Amino acid sequence: MTKLTSNRWWQLTAGIICMVMIANLQYGWTLFVAPMSKAQGWAVSDIQLAFSIFIALETWLTPLEGWIVDKLGPKRGPKLVVAAGGILVALGWILNSQANSLTALYIGAALTGAGGGAVYATCVGSAVKWFPDRRGLAVGLTAAGFGAGAALTVIPIRAVIAASGYQAAFFWFGLGQGAFVFMLAWLLRQPMPGDVRASAMVSSVIQVARSVSPGKMLVSPIFWLLYIMFVLVSASGLMATAQIALIAKDYNVSDSVLFLGATTLTVTLVVDNVMNGLARPFFGWISDRIGREFTMAIAFGLGGVAYWLLGVAGSSPLT
C-alpha cells in the first residue's frame, strides 16, 4: 500500500475521485431550488442565499484549510483535512434534508461549503506538488472531476426528487458522497522530499516555481489582478450554474423533449457538466504549451460568447 500511495498518478486519481464526490454540492444545486420552493413555500431568492453562503465558505476558507494541511505535514495533512471535509459534506446535505427553516438550510450550506473547500484545496494543492513539471495538466485533471462529476448524477438526482422528494435526494446523496470522500481520504498524502523526480518533458513554455510568503503575495499587484479576474469569471459562471433550471423554466424549454425522452434541462445539465470537466484538463494542457496568459484570454473569451448566447438565443432548446 505504501508503494501504491507513493505513486503520483495514483494520488492524482484519488484526488480526482474525491472531487467527483463533491461536484453535486455546486453543480447539482439547481435541481433542488424549485422543489424546495414549492414544498416549503420559500422565496427563490431566500433559497439561493444558501448557495451564496456555500460558495463564500467553499472559497474563502481554502487558504486556512491549505495552511492546516501544510501544518499537519505531507502524510497527515491531506488525510485529516479531506476526512473532515467528507464528514462536513455529509452533515451539510443531511441537515438540508431535515431543514424546515431557512436558518437550518443556511447552516447546512455553511457546513457543505467548508467541507467542499477542504477537499478542493487539498486535492488541487496536492496535484501541484506531485506534478511540478505538469502543473496545468494535473490541476486541470483534478478540477475536471469537480466540473464533470455532477454529470453522472443529474439523472439519478432528478429521479429521486421526482419519486421521493428533494429531502430523500439530499439525505442519500449527501451520505454517500461524504462517506466515499471520508474513506478515500486515508489513502491521500503529499510528496516527501525525493518522491518527485525532475521530468525530462520538453515544454515550449518556461515554468517557474517560486516560494512567496503570504504577506508578499497580498501586496503584489499581479495577485490582486488575478484575484479580480477570477472573481468576475467565476461569478458569471456560478450565476448561470445556480439558476440554469429556473432559466430553462422561464424560457419554457425546461421539459421540452430533445431526444430519447431526455428533457432540455437534463441534457443541458449533463452536457454542461461534461464540457466543464473536459475543458479543464484541455486548457491545463494548452497552458503548459502556450502559457497561462494566452490560455486565459481564450477561455475567458469563449465564456463571454456563451453567456451572450444564453441571453439572446436561450429560448431555443438546442441553443
Segments (PLM) and residue ranges:
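Hydrophobic core of transmembrane alpha-helices in multi-pass small-molecule transporters
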Residues: 20, 92-93, 103-118, 231, ...
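Extracytoplasmic gate region of multi-pass secondary transporters
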Residues: 27-36, 215-285
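Intracellular juxtamembrane helix-capping segments at the cytosolic ends
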Residues: 36, 118-131, 138-139
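Helix-to-loop junctions at the C-terminal end of transmembrane segments
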Residues: 61-76, 279-291
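C-terminal ends and interior cores of transmembrane alpha-helices
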Residues: 87-100, 301-315
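Helix-loop-helix hairpin linking two adjacent transmembrane segments in secondary transporters
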Residues: 142, 146-193
